[in-house]
Amino acid sequence: RMGKKIIVADPVKIPLAEIADLYLQIKPGTSVALSNGMLNVIFAEGLEDKEYIEKHTEGIEELREFVKYYTPEKTEEITGVPKELIMEAARLYASTHHSYIAYAMGITQHVNGTDNVMSLSNLALCTGNIGKKGSGVNPLRGQNNVQGACDMGALPTDYPGYQKVFDPAVQEKFEKAWGVKLNPNKGYTVTDTIPAILEDKVKLLYIMGENPAVSDPDTAHVEHALEKAFVVMQDIFLNETSKFADVVFPSTAFAEKDGTFSNTERRVQRVRKIAAVKGECRDDWWTLMQIMNRIGYPCHYDTVEDIFNELRTVTPSYAGITYEKIERNNNQGVQWPCPTEDHPGTPILHVNGPIRKGGVGLLKTLEWKPSPEAGNPEYPITLTTCRILYHYHTRTQTDRTRAVHFTAPRKWLEMG
């Protein structure tokens, strides 16, 4: 409606592709090659932002030389996208000056998912599309508070605020704040955890709001691990993983709890309880507090705000955010980093250059590698998954919503 140009790159012709100015129907697993091919065109035609590159990046010469291999013809061969469309997409993205990249789990849930995202960062850095309105590399998270969960340290490498567990200074700070000796080693990722159980490196699995019996790859392998481990589940519904649980803690849904949600633009917003908790359901934080007390770590919180205020003391990016400040801002929330209570928050990151030592972004040479699931000339067919608008992941929640289930009651296969 506003005349903005849209480029869609997706193996599946999603509804958004119908209104896109350019639709790049790439082969699954070729995102890195597409990014490199676009950079090849951008450099060849002098469309890069030379001033931004000079001030705010390192590694440009290596990258410039590296992507020479990814000519439009070579990129077409790898991705299946006509070279004319690749060139047009590169010109459109680089010449607009306020170009915004949005990506979702379609490029992250691969063996090369990290490279996929870094290749998009290369595009943004080389065209100066960082640190200004209408630009950036923006993840569309899987659901409303994935950002908030990551902010709080629900990652195998991080404490709250993305402070690294293996940083001695960070470890010392949290040990002092929490009064306990902490493990300096990185934890297991989701895909590492199942093999670790089978190798007797993990004995207990505490699952909150997940359904790995269905969502994790190699179902038989996962079920074997779940049968072997002591499994604790904390969720609002029973699901396929429940049959492996030794203990189940009934939790509360969003409308039954107080607290904050943080969205993909780092906006911390208040959530207020509007429904009474039923039966034996309890807030997640209350259940965890009871467990901590029972295993010998005494702690007491009266409200979730108490926990938030403790978090502020150890997390610089949240230090200036309070419940009162969120509400005072017309309930529009506050965007971190917000280091002090008189700080307004940060609507746009990287305004003065990337948030990295020296204010420069690192350009990476990323080689496209064929997917291990690639087909062969005899059977040139690829099976891939696609999001259903009406359902979320394993349908633990959406399958219990009558209107949603009525609209999309079954799975289907599309061929093209």
What spans do the regions from the language model cover?
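Cofactor-pocket helix-loop regions in the catalytic cores of large enzyme subunits
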Residues: 1-145, 152, 165-345, 383, ...
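Long, compositionally biased stretches
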Residues: 329-415
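Glycine-rich active-site loops that engage anionic ligands at enzyme catalytic sites
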Residues: 161
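Conserved thiamine diphosphate
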Residues: 1, 156-157, 398
